[in-house]
A protein has these predicted regions:
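Catalytic histidine-centered segment of alpha/beta-hydrolase-like enzymes
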Residues: 295-304
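Conserved acidic catalytic loop of the alpha/beta-hydrolase fold
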Residues: 92-110
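The serine-hydrolase catalytic nucleophile loop
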Residues: 44-57
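Short beta-strand/loop motif that positions the catalytic acidic residue
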Residues: 255, 261-263, 267
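Conserved hydrolase catalytic core segment
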Residues: 108-151
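Glycine-rich "HGGG/HGxG" loop immediately N-terminal to the catalytic nucleophile
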Residues: 49, 72-88
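Alpha/beta-hydrolase
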Residues: 157-159, 163-250, 257
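Conserved alpha/beta-hydrolase
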Residues: 60-77
Length: 314
């Protein structure tokens, strides 16, 4: 679904000083005074500002919210030094600072819109910011890496066996078994998952890569795009050990605000999690969980209608 681009009353890109780091945000809205929403990108290492146009075409969040698109520490057109100063705990602390900045600017509580690892970061950050956060929308959250890795490993082995092609068998053998603690293995798995239609429905890895590169060039320019690609691998190399140990089911964050979990039925990365059980484990009163048909890991792009409706009532 593509939405006609709306005229924006607010559209500004700012550099914020966040815990000793310069980080960029783009703030967009169709009218002043709308409630704030912060988008927390998937990762690790994946920037967000190059996807603003895609978010606006698919989700049109600016109709109802002042949307804060945030490039996390070390991501996008950041220095090489910034990409070496990352950790899961640091990204959580940085998000809490962005929440405080947004709440102070708007004098309203913030809705967090997290994706994949960004959803996990949002959950952890919200646990310490209940006075500033009104709710969390957790799209395809990373909840327990060990279980997710095992489910994906089984999924890939079954798909490769069914395909019966030597090329895929070689790719799976080169990938090896989890955990994946280096950027190259993490990226190899992403290629297989994308081409098996588990990330964004109907999009191959090469199609998403082209989309990524075009978006980066438009947003960061040639030199900035080279930095963004370099930073992606650097941040992954620094953070994958933290991600491998992530387990929010055994150690749930203490949240008093509602969480709205959204999963795609075709998402191998979250297939291990029983969405119906989550409201009793993570989240305050009003927490919900839904698994959406005809959607992969990027459920917000595959089924923007469902995600929009959740955001409107969150």
């Amino acid at each position: 679904m593509t939405i006609k681009k709306r005229a924006l009353a607010i559209d500004e890109t700012l550099a914020l000083d966040i815990n000793g780091s310069r980080q960029q945000v783009r703030v967009c809205a169709t009218a002043p005074g709308l409630p704030p929403l912060i988008v927390v990108q998937q990762g690790p290492g994946i920037p967000l500002l190059h996807e603003v146009a895609k978010f606006q075409r698919r989700l049109d969040l600016e109709r109802d919210f002042l949307v804060v698109y945030w490039d996390q520490r070390g991501c996008g057109n950041a220095s090489a030094a910034e990409a070496l100063r990352v950790s899961l705990a640091q990204q959580v602390a940085d998000l809490q600072a962005v929440i405080a900045w947004t709440a102070d600017r708007t004098q309203q509580r913030v809705l967090l819109f997290g994706i994949s690892l960004g959803a996990a970061i949002a959950l952890l950050a919200a646990a310490g910011e209940s006075t500033r956060v009104r709710a969390v929308i957790a799209n395809s959250p990373d909840l327990q890496t060990r279980a997710a890795d095992a489910a994906v490993d089984a999924f890939l082995r079954e798909r490769v066996r069914s395909a019966g092609t030597p090329r895929l068998a070689r790719a799976l053998a080169k990938l090896g078994s989890p955990p994946y603690l280096d950027a190259r293995s993490f990226q190899r798995r992403a290629v297989l998952l994308t081409d098996f239609d588990s990330i964004e429905r109907g999009k191959t890895f090469n199609a998403l890569l082209r989309e990524l590169l075009v978006g980066m060039l438009k947003t960061y320019g040639i030199v900035g795009s080279v930095r963004a690609l370099r930073n992606m691998s650097a941040v992954q190399s620094r953070m994958l050990t933290d991600v491998a140990a992530l387990d929010l089911l055994s150690h749930p964050p203490a949240l008093s605000v509602p969480v709205h979990f959204v999963f795609g039925e075709q998402d191998a990365l979250t297939a291990a999690f029983m969405s119906g059980e989550l409201p009793g484990v993570i989240g305050g009163p009003g927490t919900t969980a839904v698994r959406v048909p005809e959607a992969g890991h990027l459920v917000h792009f595959d089924r923007p209608d469902v995600v929009q409706a959740i955001a409107e009532t969150a």
